[in-house]
């Protein structure tokens, strides 16, 4: 009897609503951090294991899915990568432009000290682009070990095209391997409530939010701008694409993808989650198996906002005058920097000195701005990743649904 009850409970947990279970884990994590700080720090291991498992499986998932989809691609079957890529770039630039408007409407100032982070940022945009190009010719084993998704994509696409000329047995083997890795991903994702419980507990216990109050205005501007992009700018772009109410799709992506990304704070770790959501939305597998890992690399609306807002906060603090053409140029520079953020250790924060260089701000002061970014990183990085990752699915779904409707309309006319 006890065994039957236990198996019934496990079955309900395995088949229950993952979002509801995550909310329970979130509440329990907050309560544990409030009741016992040492215990909360100890259960942080659960969160570390969960994020580690996602990061471990994501590179293999991308390699196998992309390779399988291209190897088994039928001649004449169309994918929607080009419109998705256009949406990625347009969305990132729109986010940078929104951040400029927000920063001028609600100017922030920083408390800059004489000390700076002992970190060497990229010296220019050319170096960032060079790093991206070099990552394309990375050794495949090295790319998998270091989660270099540009390198993984290049090898997966190349091997996929090569395997098109292979026999059906080989293609079936690759497809079976892809399905096996997908099953492993689903298994890992079921542990999300436990992982988020550990992440929330340890974060509140070790950092807390007391240090964030000194930067409340800056955080409000940053997060407010990200909310504007998530709830206004992105829906407008999706409406332009699908010509109907975009909000059901927007909220589904924020709920199913953004929540995970907020707590894991890793676009790479969220790739399996996004892949599962694309499958749930019944999108074309040949399309999303390429667009999702590509989006995790270049679709960086949140990074563009972070770079723009923190740069203009430094500009306002130092009293540097900014005209409209310079502000527009900053949007372009921030967009380019954001697209290269995944190839830089430290991500968007370490690309701030590139944008600061436009205004003649010395490197030591620019690195102090980076230090401010690290202080508010608990919330900034979480919100940035949630926006970046949920937008990957949103734009992929919008492009796929728009193409499906176009084909359906053409069929009706004929």
UniProtKB/Swiss-Prot annotation:
Coiled coil (UniProt feature): none
Xref: SUPFAM superfamilies: Proton glutamate symport protein (SSF118215)
UniProtKB keywords: Amino-acid transport, Cell inner membrane, Cell membrane, Membrane, Symport, Transmembrane, Transmembrane helix, Transport
GO CC annotations on file: plasma membrane
Membrane-crossing segments per the record: 16-36, 46-66, 84-104, 143-163, 180-200, 219-239, 300-320, 332-352
Membrane topology classification: Multi-pass membrane protein
Pfam family, one: SDF
GO biological process, one term: threonine transport
Molecular function GO labels: neutral L-amino acid:sodium symporter activity
Subcellular location: Cell inner membrane
Domain of life: Bacteria
Signal peptide extent: none
Catalysed reactions, as listed in the record: L-serine(in) + Na(+)(in) = L-serine(out) + Na(+)(out); L-threonine(in) + Na(+)(in) = L-threonine(out) + Na(+)(out)
Cited HAMAP family: Ser_Thr_transp_SstT
Functional note: Involved in the import of serine and threonine into the cell, with the concomitant import of sodium (symport system).
Family: Belongs to the dicarboxylate/amino acid:cation symporter (DAACS) (TC 2.A.23) family.
Family matches, as PANTHER family: PROTON/GLUTAMATE-ASPARTATE SYMPORTER (PTHR42865), SERINE_THREONINE TRANSPORTER SSTT (PTHR42865:SF8)
Protein's recorded name: Serine/threonine transporter SstT
Organism per entry: Salmonella schwarzengrund (strain CVM19633)
